[in-house]
């Protein structure tokens, strides 16, 4: 516990029992969800709000807590603390946990109880670091699952579709953290997403997506090529658009930053040894593999403006999106076949070795031969009245629609100014003329 004084006044999480009253608990916040609103069944036309979090006071004991109330109270309470803070909760209601129903959407905990906070009776206080024993603070670096209970990124890729929809644990290093992107849904709800690229000794780049504000805030604190994370209970899916496996942070997920476990120390040494040399040469561009909402792209550019924008943003990780009215000035489909189409593994979706026609990822530890399929990889030039963009990448479904053939998504070119075509169709001359006149998006 925090200290001898704290040990006398706080109830440990291991001692919690239903219907206990007038108690105080202390713990480190190891997980937290966003505030959500739901229609109030008792008051038609109004909403009730809720959020939940998970606290821990020892290596073996942690519990979920939730609070319901009006919008102002819930948002104020949620904003008062973050993951990593130590909190004191006074007068929570102790209820028995409905394991099967609640752990479907909440983190699995060893306790049979849960805490319910009410506006009228419960309080939450954030402790300053000097008030708390370092043993309690150190719990933030201890995963909630066994240190060996995880998949390597290479294992996930190798298993492919067999892990689709599964909830698993992942230990990996942070390669990059994308900027949060905000959007509004068709029913006018605001949302956000952030993509984190992970890597380890077995895989050079793997996408993990955060959809809630709490996990995005946590991700923004990570240092690329320095931070290691243990992500407990992330959902794994095969992304048909990207043709690869991806991870998603869900409401069950608890992410431990820089976990204090031997496996993480080994990975950390790997990061340090390869930080400067960057020997991982099979990198897949993360932004090209993101799902892009074309309806949100409204800025119109000329070739000259795009080149100027590229020079201005040189060195920045985020891509730029825009509309270009141009004609295809080079479409070299008469080139060697190997430069127009590539073979991909039907299991993991990665490009296979051209000489052996075998996937080194899936077949290196298996006698089962994995089939391959053809994938477009066409480089085109786009030209307008201001200049030409050379070696633009025309791949995937866009290439299929443009060329009238049916292959699937391929990697894009890796050198020079990189342009990816997200949509390609005939432009109305009047519309093109109107948009090209007086546009300034540099």
Swiss-Prot record:
In fetal gonads, specifically expressed in the ovary starting at the 14th weeks post fertilization. In the adult, restricted to testis. The keyword Cytoplasm applies. Pfam families: OB_MEIOB_N. InterPro entries: MEIOB (IPR052469), NA-bd_OB-fold (IPR012340), OB_MEIOB_N (IPR056880). Disulfide bonds: none annotated. GO terms for biological process: double-strand break repair via homologous recombination; female meiosis I; fertilization; homologous chromosome pairing at meiosis; male meiosis I; male meiotic nuclear division; resolution of meiotic recombination intermediates. One of its GO terms (molecular function) is single-stranded DNA binding. Residues 167-272 bind DNA. Keywords: Chromosome, Cytoplasm, Disease variant, DNA-binding, Exonuclease, Hydrolase, Meiosis, Nuclease, Nucleus, Premature ovarian failure. Transmembrane segments: none annotated. Its EC number is 3.1.-.-. GO terms for cellular component: chromosome; cytoplasm; nucleus. Its main location: cytoplasm. CDD domains: RPA1_DBD_B. It is found in: Cytoplasm; Nucleus; Chromosome. It is an enzyme of class 3 (hydrolase). Belongs to the MEIOB family. It is linked to Spermatogenic failure 22: An infertility disorder caused by spermatogenesis defects that result in non-obstructive azoospermia. Premature ovarian failure 23: A form of premature ovarian failure, an ovarian disorder defined as the cessation of ovarian function under the age of 40 years. It is characterized by oligomenorrhea or amenorrhea, in the presence of elevated levels of serum gonadotropins and low estradiol. POF23 inheritance is autosomal recessive. Single-stranded DNA-binding protein required for homologous recombination in meiosis I. Required for double strand breaks (DSBs) repair and crossover formation and promotion of faithful and complete synapsis. Not required for the initial loading of recombinases but required to maintain a proper number of RAD51 and DMC1 foci after the zygotene stage. May act by ensuring the stabilization of recombinases, which is required for successful homology search and meiotic recombination. Displays Single-stranded DNA 3'-5' exonuclease activity in vitro. Component of a multiprotein complex with RPA2 and SPATA22. Interacts with SPATA22. Interacts with the complex BRME1:HSF2BP:BRCA2. This is Meiosis-specific with OB domain-containing protein. It comes from Homo sapiens.
């Amino acid at each position: 516990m925090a200290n001898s004084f704290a040990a006398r006044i706080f109830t440990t999480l291991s001692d919690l029992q239903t219907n206990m009253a007038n108690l105080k608990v202390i713990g480190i916040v190891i997980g937290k969800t966003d505030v959500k609103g739901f229609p109030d069944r008792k008051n038609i036309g109004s909403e009730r709000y809720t959020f939940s979090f998970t606290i821990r006071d020892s290596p073996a004991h942690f519990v979920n807590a939730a609070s319901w109330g009006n919008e102002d109270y819930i948002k104020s309470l949620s904003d008062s603390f973050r993951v990593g803070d130590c909190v004191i909760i006074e007068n929570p209601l102790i209820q028995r946990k409905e394991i099967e129903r609640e752990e479907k959407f909440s983190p699995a905990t060893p306790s049979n109880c849960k805490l319910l906070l009410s506006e009228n009776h419960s309080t939450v206080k954030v402790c300053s670091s000097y008030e708390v024993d370092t043993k309690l603070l150190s719990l933030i670096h201890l995963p909630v699952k066994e240190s060996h209970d995880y998949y390597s990124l290479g294992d996930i890729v190798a298993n492919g579709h067999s892990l689709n929809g599964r909830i698993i644990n992942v230990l990996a290093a942070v390669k990059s953290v994308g900027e949060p992107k905000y959007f509004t849904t068709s029913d006018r709800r605001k949302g956000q997403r952030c993509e984190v690229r992970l890597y380890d000794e077995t895989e050079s780049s793997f996408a993990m997506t955060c959809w809630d504000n709490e996990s995005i805030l946590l991700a923004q604190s990570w240092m690329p090529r320095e931070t290691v994370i243990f992500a407990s209970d992330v959902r794994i899916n095969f992304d048909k658009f990207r043709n690869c496996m991806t991870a998603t942070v869900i409401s069950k997920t608890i992410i431990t930053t820089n976990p204090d476990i031997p496996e993480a120390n080994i990975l950390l040494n790997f990061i340090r040894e390869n930080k400067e040399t960057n020997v991982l040469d099979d990198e897949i561009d993360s932004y090209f593999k993101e799902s892009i909402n074309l309806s949100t792209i409204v800025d119109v550019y000329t070739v000259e403006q795009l080149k100027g924008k590229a020079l201005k943003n040189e060195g920045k990780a985020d891509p730029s999106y825009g509309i270009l009215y141009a004609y295809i000035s080079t479409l070299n489909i008469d080139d060697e076949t190997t430069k127009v189409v590539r073979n991909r593994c039907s299991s993991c979706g990665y490009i296979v070795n051209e000489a052996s026609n075998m996937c080194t990822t899936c077949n290196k530890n298996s006698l089962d031969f994995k089939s391959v399929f053809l994938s477009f990889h066409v480089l085109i030039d786009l030209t307008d009245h201001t200049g030409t963009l050379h070696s633009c990448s025309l791949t995937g479904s866009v290439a299929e629609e443009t060329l009238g053939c049916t292959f699937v998504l391929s990697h894009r070119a890796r050198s020079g100014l990189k342009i990816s075509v997200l949509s390609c169709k005939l432009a109305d001359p009047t519309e093109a003329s109107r948009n090209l006149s007086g546009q300034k998006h540099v």
